[in-house]
From Swiss-Prot:
This is 1-(5-phosphoribosyl)-5-[(5-phosphoribosylamino)methylideneamino] imidazole-4-carboxamide isomerase. Keywords: Amino-acid biosynthesis, Cytoplasm, Histidine biosynthesis, Isomerase. One of its GO terms (molecular function) is 1-(5-phosphoribosyl)-5-[(5-phosphoribosylamino)methylideneamino]imidazole-4-carboxamide isomerase activity. Its EC number is 5.3.1.16. CDD domains: HisA (cd04732). It catalyses: 1-(5-phospho-beta-D-ribosyl)-5-[(5-phospho-beta-D-ribosylamino)methylideneamino]imidazole-4-carboxamide = 5-[(5-phospho-1-deoxy-D-ribulos-1-ylimino)methylamino]-1-(5-phospho-beta-D-ribosyl)imidazole-4-carboxamide. It is an enzyme of class 5 (isomerase). Transmembrane segments: none annotated. Belongs to the HisA/HisF family. Its main location: cytoplasm. Pathway: Amino-acid biosynthesis; L-histidine biosynthesis; L-histidine from 5-phospho-alpha-D-ribose 1-diphosphate: step 4/9. The active site is at 8 (proton acceptor), 129 (proton donor).
Amino acid sequence: MLVIPAIDLMGGEAVRLEKGDFATKTVYARHPAEKAEEFARAGATLLHVVDLDGAKAGWPVNLDAVRAICEVPGIEVELGGGLRSLPDIEKVLALGVRYVVLGTAAVERLGLVEQACQRFPGQVRAGIDARNGEVKIAGWLEGTGLAAVDVARKVKGAGVGLVEYTDVARDGMFTGVDAAGAARIQAEAGIPVVASGGVASLDDVTACRAAGLAGVIVGKALYERRIDLAAAIRAAAA
């Protein structure tokens, strides 16, 4: 199982939010690429990057920071946030991004998801963010009335090969990851799922591994030094 460290970008800096609330920003690194280097040294092979400004704007914003992160050797990058057109997807892939994570587009523009999967096979993932079971979009600011498992089924039908599921209510709160909810989506939709949101300790990593998930995304727990990344990677492989 993969342990995927996260970098959230705002104003070119690495930040973290609580429950996706833009008013709770904490800056952790002025130069996000240095964080990427640190994670690569610890043994991570994939980095989860979110362009928070892009998620609000509807198009990629932090391109300079993304480019710098992609230039870090030894670690691949997946990027989400504001990717809602084929030209924007193409633009970030050209920067060196390995996978794109479509969130709002996965809900509102399934046709775009299908086109992206056909044009960039194997490089398109879906980010499904939910609060109390309801999928949220536009940087978690808008509700949809849709259930996460239903969206997962639809994106699988569109050609997506993996879903990244975030419990927004847990994100940045150290309340424990929703491994059971992620496993339920994986089983019912028949698609590999990576869990995110609320990871607080190595117990969360082992819970995701025990649930048979494809991976777990770890963010604030790394920045607050609650989890040692190298130890988490070892726990996921045990």
